């Protein structure tokens, strides 16, 4: 793996040193492991792990701390994404699920369902289909109006008429309001693949915005006070010609008070990019161009120095953590968390209650789920 020249490979000069992690296996046999979500599913104050595996017919969760396996629902096919949030206030989240996925939209059922428990989340949940939108691919809950009530954001991979993902058609972003569950279009401005979405209160006004990452680059979607969605380009992503252009997954972090945007680029790409704003323009810096089939990116302050690290997982295979080397986020150092984890997805949460953020990742070709215990900064 080649790191670009401005990435430092020496001892961390600023902030706390890199963190030590201890790896723990939660589960194996998760064929086509694709997503892990960290959420308290049984209202006991401990964060559990939901594992979605596209090659399985069961959606399962593992109960913290012993990681006992429970089946949420079965007889499912081609599951691709889920999101969890307690919409009725009973302390146990509801789950929205996208299934029936195929890479080519004309072969994708695009089933969107709502899953609710029947009183005991350790038993089977009710599954209610609410929509079919071909190529439904990413789901997130978002409080778009600051009311405290969230809606479901659904991002298909491509236009429903696309024969291949590379077709240059407009790709919609839609939403569902709990209760009515009627599909509402947010935008159809994107072209080609839109692979990732990220929910963030971008401007600190108490309302969530949406970041999208796709062939068209990285864009911010914000609902105005008069109910109109506004779309703003943050960056174009990889400048290569179509369809090797744009972005794939996106996350937001901070180095001190300074915000940055982290991305995997292009689609399922080989690059980890950091964007920093200067004079209204988001400047692109590729800090690693040696990953393979990049598929997940997150930020968190693992060592408590006030500077978020970047976690990048790739199915090619590996999980890396990048540490800022200065107070501006201009220089970064890479450490390898796990060279044997073909991470399709990771999640960040305090899984053992010690106040430190831990990492969980699910492997695609290895069909396993692991969590990485944050042991604190290494001694120097």
Residues covered by each model-derived region:
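Universal eukaryotic N-terminal targeting presequences
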Residues: 1-2, 122
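Sec-dependent N-terminal signal peptides
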Residues: 3-13
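Beta-propeller-forming repeat regions
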Residues: 15-380
């Amino acid at each position: 793996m080649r790191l670009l020249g401005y990435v430092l490979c020496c001892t961390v000069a600023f902030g706390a040193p890199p963190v030590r992690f201890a790896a723990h296996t939660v589960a194996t046999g998760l064929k086509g492991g694709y997503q892990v979500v960290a959420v308290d599913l049984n209202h006991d104050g401990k964060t559990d792990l939901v594992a979605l595996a596209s090659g399985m017919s069961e959606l399962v969760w593992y109960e913290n701390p012993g990681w006992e396996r429970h089946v949420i629902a079965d007889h499912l096919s081609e599951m691709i994404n889920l999101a969890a949030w307690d919409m009725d206030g009973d302390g146990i989240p509801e789950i929205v699920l996208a299934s029936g996925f195929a890479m080519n939209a004309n072969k994708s059922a695009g089933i969107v369902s709502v899953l609710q428990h029947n009183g005991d989340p350790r038993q089977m949940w009710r599954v209610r289909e609410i929509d079919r939108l071909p190529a439904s691919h990413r789901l997130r809950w978002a409080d778009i109006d600051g009311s405290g009530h969230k809606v479901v954001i659904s991002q298909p991979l491509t236009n429903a008429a696309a024969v291949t993902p590379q077709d240059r058609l407009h790709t919609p972003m839609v939403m569902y309001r709990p209760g009515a569950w009627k599909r509402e279009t947010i935008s159809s401005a994107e072209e080609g693949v839109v692979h990732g979405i990220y929910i963030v209160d971008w401007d600190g006004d108490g309302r969530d915005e949406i970041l999208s990452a796709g062939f068209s680059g990285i864009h911010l979607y914000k609902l105005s006070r008069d109910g109109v969605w506004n779309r703003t380009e943050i960056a174009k992503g990889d400048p290569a010609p179509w369809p090797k252009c744009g972005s794939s997954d996106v996350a937001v972090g901070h180095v001190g008070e300074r915000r940055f945007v982290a991305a995997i680029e292009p689609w399922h790409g080989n690059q980890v990019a950091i964007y920093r704003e200067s004079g209204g323009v988001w400047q692109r810096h590729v800090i690693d161009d040696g990953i393979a089939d990049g598929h997940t990116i997150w930020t968190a302050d693992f060592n408590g120095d006030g500077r978020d690290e970047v976690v990048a997982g790739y199915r090619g295979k590996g999980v890396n953590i990048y540490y800022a080397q200065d107070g501006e986020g201009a220089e970064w150092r890479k450490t390898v968390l796990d060279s044997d984890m073909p991470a399709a997805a990771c999640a960040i949460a305090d899984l053992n209650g010690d106040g430190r953020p831990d990492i969980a990742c699910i492997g695609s070709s290895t069909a396993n789920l692991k969590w990485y215990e944050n042991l604190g900064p290494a001694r120097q």
